[in-house]
Amino acid sequence: IRRDNACIGIIMLSAKSLESDKIKGLAIGADDYMTKPFSISELLARIDALMRRVQRLAPEKQTDGRLVSGQFVLDQKSRMLYKNGEEIELTQVEFQIMELFFVNSGVAMVREQILQGVWGEGYFGDVKIVDVNIRRLRMKIEEEASAPKHILTVWGYGYRWNG
């Protein structure tokens, strides 16, 4: 589901109530986890809260092929990135990583997800190529690459875009 639409909220409903089951459900991609029995009013409240969060995190998509995230504009037609109106030149791979980040804004992604999203499922190289490209992107878009504010490291996990 996440591969088809990264800006969709997922609530897992389960009869399994052990803490380890809840942790596993959240780790595999659920945004929320509810155990049976539950009330319909609680489910509806959680759906409303999740929808607010997803709408806030989703990039502002415009009909002209541009994605907007904070001070950044990713123009999919010209394959250009702009920060505060200034053009930032990107390689093809860097552009694809940024596109993946914009579509998954606020979502922590493991290196393997980034590899699959950019290089495809058939790539069998080292996942460290993601780190190399992230380092290059940070040098291009961050005020201070050593203290990033946009491409954040999620320690022990991967990266998250904060537009």
Name each model-derived stretch.
Residues 3-67:
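Basic, amphipathic DNA-recognition helix from helix-turn-helix-like DNA-binding domains
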Residues 57, 64, 89, 134, ...:
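DNA-binding patch around the recognition helix
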Residues 41, 107-118:
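Short coil-to-helix segment of the ABC ATPase nucleotide-binding domain corresponding to the Q-loop/switch region
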Residues 11-13, 98, 152:
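Conserved hydrophobic packing residues within short motifs/helices of P-loop NTPase cores
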Residues 37, 44, 91, 124, ...:
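Conserved catalytic core of two-component sensor histidine kinases
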Residues 46, 93, 126, 133, ...:
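Residues within the DNA-recognition helix of helix-turn-helix
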Residues 97-98, 114, 137, 141:
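DNA major-groove recognition helices of helix-turn-helix
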Residues 49-108, 112:
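Short, Lys/Arg-enriched segments at the junction into DNA-binding effector domains
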